[in-house]
Design a protein with these regions (language model features):
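Short, conserved phosphate/pyrophosphate- and ester-handling motifs at nucleotide-, phospho-/glycolipid
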Residues: 7-8, 77, 107, 168
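A conserved switch/coupling segment of P-loop NTPase cores
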Residues: 16-23, 58-129
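Alpha-helical elements of the RecA-like P-loop NTPase motor core of helicases
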Residues: 22, 39-40, 88, 115, ...
Length: 174
């Protein structure tokens, strides 16, 4: 989905959910952005046991050991690069070392990234929120849930602001 639509926020809700926390032995969040850096990602997955070396094969071995036999959740947030060669180098040890039931959740704006990842589950495409949802969220954030529905002035101002935000939650969060 487009920027500001709520991909990262939704992924954070999943990542921080108590059932998700108890289901996975290891959870890792990596803000990827651009460029797609396999060494940075592998070191993030390795956590405290990350090597100081920047030699890719060695870093990938350390990453493999850190997840060996563990059910993990890896969130790769804001992936732009769709270079399948780089992804395959990182993906292979993740699949080989992690326990059955491990998951990789990816947020991206680009359909090419989804194709490159060869996802085994469906992509969830987020769209703009309806006017009603936007108004509800905006009022919650702007007025801390005080009763604003009875005030026509507040309602008109809220609607004018939301028209400019075009259904993007990040726009009215700012």
């Amino acid at each position: 989905g487009m920027g500001g639509i709520g991909k990262t926020t939704l992924a954070q809700l999943v990542y921080n959910d108590s059932k998700v926390k108890s289901h996975f032995e290891k959870r890792v969040w990596v803000c990827v952005s651009d460029p797609f850096d396999e060494i940075k990602i592998a070191k993030s997955i390795s956590g405290d046991g990350a090597p100081s070396s920047n030699e890719l094969d060695y870093v990938l071995q350390c990453m493999s050991r850190s997840i060996e036999g563990k059910r993990f959740l890896l969130v790769l947030d804001d992936v732009w690069n769709h270079d399948s060669e780089k992804w395959d180098r990182l993906r292979a040890p993740l699949i080989q070392s992690g326990a059955h039931g491990s998951r990789i959740l990816v947020t991206t704006r680009k359909h090419e990234v989804v194709d490159m990842m060869r996802a085994t589950s469906d992509m969830i495409s987020l769209g703009e929120l309806s006017e009603g949802y936007c108004l509800s969220i905006f009022n919650h954030m702007a007025f801390a849930d005080r009763e604003v529905g009875e005030s026509k002035a507040f309602e008109d101002i809220s609607k004018k602001i939301l028209e400019k935000c075009k259904g993007l939650p990040l726009a009215f969060k700012i």
